[in-house]
């Protein structure tokens, strides 16, 4: 059982957005790998999250939906306003 481990060699990971390079030992065949987002430019790691990227739990989402449903139930439905009279319907013989 000799020589069963893969050969590891240095591989360069290039971030496409911020142009930063990481050199990591890897068993990959390529010597260069392009990645889209790294720890230098991802919003989670740099602390610039907005409301859409903030992580929320399932229970909080369920509570928000439940409260929205209760608010809709408690509202009285608005009456539709009639905007003038429309023409009476014609029968097939009249057309």
Curated annotation (Swiss-Prot):
Membrane spanning residue stretches: none
Q: Which cysteines are joined by disulfide bonds?
A: none
InterPro entries membership = Ribosomal_bL28/bL31-like_sf (IPR034704), Ribosomal_bL31 (IPR002150), Ribosomal_bL31_A (IPR027491), Ribosomal_bL31_sf (IPR042105)
Region named Disordered: 68-95
- An example Pfam family from this entry, by short name, is Ribosomal_L31
Q: Name one GO molecular function term.
A: rRNA binding
One Gene Ontology term, aspect cellular component = ribosome
Keywords associated with the record: Ribonucleoprotein, Ribosomal protein, RNA-binding, rRNA-binding
Quote the biased-composition stretches of kind Basic and acidic residues, using this chain's numbering: 80-95
A GO biological process of this protein is: translation
SUPFAM superfamilies from the UniProt entry: L28p-like (SSF143800)
Family stated for the protein in its record: Belongs to the bacterial ribosomal protein bL31 family. Type A subfamily.
Q: What does this protein do?
A: Binds the 23S rRNA.
* Self-association and partners: Part of the 50S ribosomal subunit.
The protein's matches in NCBIfam families, at most eight in alphabetical order, are given as: L31, PRK00019.1
HAMAP family recorded for this chain? Answer: Ribosomal_bL31_1 (MF_00501)
Name listed for the protein in its UniProt record: Large ribosomal subunit protein bL31
Q: Name the species this protein comes from.
A: Ureaplasma parvum serovar 3 (strain ATCC 700970)
């Amino acid at each position: 059982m000799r020589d069963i481990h893969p050969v590891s060699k240095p591989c360069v990971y290039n971030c496409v957005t911020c142009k930063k390079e990481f050199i990591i030992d890897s068993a990959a065949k390529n010597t260069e790998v392009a990645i889209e987002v790294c720890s230098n430019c991802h919003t989670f790691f740099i602390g610039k999250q907005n409301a859409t990227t903030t992580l929320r739990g399932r229970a909080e989402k369920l509570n928000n939906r439940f409260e929205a449903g209760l608010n809709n139930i408690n509202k009285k439905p608005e009456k539709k306003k009639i905007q003038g009279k429309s023409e009476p319907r014609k029968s097939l013989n009249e057309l």
